[in-house]
Amino acid sequence: MGSRAICIQRVAPPCFEASQVKKIKTVGSFLVNTRSKRRRSTGVKCSSIADYIGGDLVKPDIGQWLQDVEEHKAIAIYAPHEGGYEGRYLNRLKMQGYYFLDISARGLGDPETTLLKNYPVCPAHLGKQPIARWYYPPEVDYRLAALPPSAKGLVVWVLEAKVLSKSELQFLALLPSLRPNVRVIAECGNWRKFVWKPLAEIANLAAQE
């Protein structure tokens, strides 16, 4: 019996004092209160009606958009990160009679060679086939030749143009002068609302002239 009593005393959990228990409770309640205060303080506040509806839908700037595209012919756009805003401006150009060529700046290579010249492409091989080289027609000239007579022109929409160098952006800004029926829209970055600028200004062509 005595040995059993000793084992029970060893297995029994340690006892906390009343002061220690009170401290733990107070600390726990303090943490809960601070968390609730932080949650209440962090909130999204809408300052105007544009925050509820969307700044893109509030601004009636479609007329200015079409006018700038026809005047400058090469535009750099900055769309919000969530995307979807540029579709409204794209559809309005499509309603004007433009056809689109969507290309990505990543993996484009030399824009002048890809868009205006016959450019080579080496297909992947497994080591047993001979190394081949295929040639593709120029992207812009090929699609200009395939446009219907009722088309107003071709819009080259460049995705992720922020990775292009200044010289490549300068070529895109000069492309409408080489092909009069071509308009260039380059996505050069992101902003809180949909804004655009002449691509020649972004590529520093205006300063050089």
Swiss-Prot record:
<comment type="function">
    <text>NDH shuttles electrons from NAD(P)H:plastoquinone, via FMN and iron-sulfur (Fe-S) centers, to quinones in the photosynthetic chain and possibly in a chloroplast respiratory chain. The immediate electron acceptor for the enzyme in this species is believed to be plastoquinone. Couples the redox reaction to proton translocation, and thus conserves the redox energy in a proton gradient.</text>
</comment>
<keyword id="KW-0813">Transport</keyword>
<keyword id="KW-0793">Thylakoid</keyword>
<dbReference type="GO" id="GO:0009535">
    <property type="term" value="C:chloroplast thylakoid membrane"/>
</dbReference>
<protein>
    <recommendedName>
        <fullName>NAD(P)H-quinone oxidoreductase subunit N, chloroplastic</fullName>
        <ecNumber>7.1.1.-</ecNumber>
    </recommendedName>
</protein>
<dbReference type="GO" id="GO:0048038">
    <property type="term" value="F:quinone binding"/>
</dbReference>
<keyword id="KW-1278">Translocase</keyword>
<dbReference type="GO" id="GO:0016655">
    <property type="term" value="F:oxidoreductase activity, acting on NAD(P)H, quinone or similar compound as acceptor"/>
</dbReference>
<dbReference type="Pfam" id="PF11909">
    <property type="entry name" value="NdhN"/>
</dbReference>
<keyword id="KW-0150">Chloroplast</keyword>
<keyword id="KW-0934">Plastid</keyword>
<comment type="subunit">
    <text>Part of the chloroplast NDH complex, composed of a mixture of chloroplast and nucleus encoded subunits. Component of the NDH subcomplex A, at least composed of ndhH, ndhI, ndhJ, ndhK, ndhL, ndhM, ndhN and ndhO.</text>
</comment>
<dbReference type="InterPro" id="IPR020874">
    <property type="entry name" value="NAD(P)H-quinone_OxRdtase_su_N"/>
</dbReference>
<keyword id="KW-0874">Quinone</keyword>
<dbReference type="GO" id="GO:0009941">
    <property type="term" value="C:chloroplast envelope"/>
</dbReference>
<dbReference type="GO" id="GO:0009507">
    <property type="term" value="C:chloroplast"/>
</dbReference>
<keyword id="KW-0809">Transit peptide</keyword>
<dbReference type="GO" id="GO:0010258">
    <property type="term" value="P:NADH dehydrogenase complex (plastoquinone) assembly"/>
</dbReference>
<dbReference type="GO" id="GO:0009536">
    <property type="term" value="C:plastid"/>
</dbReference>
<dbReference type="GO" id="GO:0050832">
    <property type="term" value="P:defense response to fungus"/>
</dbReference>
<comment type="similarity">
    <text>Belongs to the NDH complex subunit N family.</text>
</comment>
<keyword id="KW-0521">NADP</keyword>
<feature type="transit peptide" description="Chloroplast">
    <location>
        <begin position="1"/>
        <end position="45"/>
    </location>
</feature>
<dbReference type="GO" id="GO:0010598">
    <property type="term" value="C:NAD(P)H dehydrogenase complex (plastoquinone)"/>
</dbReference>
<keyword id="KW-0520">NAD</keyword>
<keyword id="KW-0472">Membrane</keyword>
<keyword id="KW-0618">Plastoquinone</keyword>
